[in-house]
Amino acid sequence: MSQSKADYINVIGAGLAGSEAAYQIAKRGIPVKLYEMRGVKATPQHKTTNFAELVCSNSFRGDSLTNAVGLLKEEMRRLDSIIMRNGEAHRVPAGGAMAVDREGYAEAVTAEIESHPLIEVIRKEITEIPDDAITVIASGPLTSDALAEKIHELNGGDGFYFYDAAAPIVDKATIDMNKVYLKSRYDKGEAAYLNCPMTKEEFMAFYEALTTAEEAPLNSFEKEKYFEGCMPIEVMAKRGIKTMLYGPMKPVGLEYPEDYMGPRDGDFKTPYAVVQLRQDNAAGSLYNIVGFQTHLKWGEQKRVFQMIPGLENAEFVRYGVMHRNSYMDSPNLLKQTFQSKSNPNLFFAGQMTGVEGYVESAASGLVAGINAARLFKGEDEVIFPHTTAIGSLPYYVTHAESKHFQPMNVNFGIIKELEGPRIRDKKERYEKIAERSLKDLQTFIDA
């Protein structure tokens, strides 16, 4: 254990991870200096200067406890996550998922942090790793070049990266509502998605246009590599026709409504393919194209995506874009507390550690923030149980094989298996894992 003589903790970056870390530290009575460069220096992807801004989708994904990210969210609620609390307060309809009004949510997080008496917000670019105090670096996948270079030096000079993409957003008022229908897959939750059905002929024409459309050039000579969870739709399409039909355009559970009068293949009750649109803001005036992250040129996006039934005259308020994300060699560099192995006063959090996704990033900030606060107070570190979702993430990123390490979403495969004979029914198995997880977390909290 080591600790600084400074009477505060630095947090660099006010994204989901940094905001969560700063809050967790401050709620434990410790002053925080929170640095955020947006406001003095922009990033290629962020649209505002708000904290915890969502730059890709507005979805925090599944909300059921039989979904690993749903379990992680429930664990975070029980640990008083500022991200979860404000996300809940700004939910928008999304069926069985948790989606938020991205602007209202980010504004609320920003207001709560800026008004906290123990958090000093400093709008400034950090170009060196501070050595004046315990520090949590949560500068995100869009870390500025100068700081990224210093982190890469810690990384042994290796530039670990992948490319990430965002989906387009359309104005609902410009959608032809006669060609789409409201429904959630398998009718789970409220009917929260606008569905754009395609016949086989429409799909094949769309597929041809998508796979031959011109992509925007990358800003780097480096080889393209993508994280599977945010892969551009055109890259996915080039893997084969069926890839999209089993992915974002999967029609299963999205049967035509009885009053549907549009084109269909014969008397089929289910479309050949479906493009889903999800509400993006509380007012319900904006919808994003689910799973359609893209790096096509903007003119090509307009041409190709207006082939989707209902979007023939759609106005795109934001086109899809792609950016480079960096992440660390966490198995070699970090402890399960998200603490540097070489410098105990240094913590990392967020996507740069190899956790992937909004919720996962915030969870890493929660763990790093708690442990930075404990180090400040001279207390022992805490390692969350491997039987919990919030414990399985740091376990995974610090125990994976370094050579093949890639970013990871939370999933039941990284949570410690149940003892005893394997339960064959997947839903029942996940229910048992979730039950054990929440019980173990409560025991851990009470200890």
Curated annotation (Swiss-Prot):
Annotated FAD binding sites: G13, A14, G15, L16, A17, G18
Superkingdom as given in the UniProt entry: Bacteria
A cellular-component GO term for this protein: cytosol
Region forming the signal peptide: none
Disulphide bonds in the chain: none
Cofactor: FAD
UniProt keyword annotations, A-Z: Cytoplasm, FAD, Flavoprotein, Methyltransferase, NAD, NADP, Transferase, tRNA processing
NADP found in the keyword field: yes
EC number(s) on file: 2.1.1.74
InterPro entries, sorted: FAD/NAD-bd_sf, MnmG-rel, MnmG-rel_CS, MnmG_N, TrmFO
Stated family: Belongs to the MnmG family. TrmFO subfamily.
Protein's name according to its UniProt entry: Methylenetetrahydrofolate--tRNA-(uracil-5-)-methyltransferase TrmFO
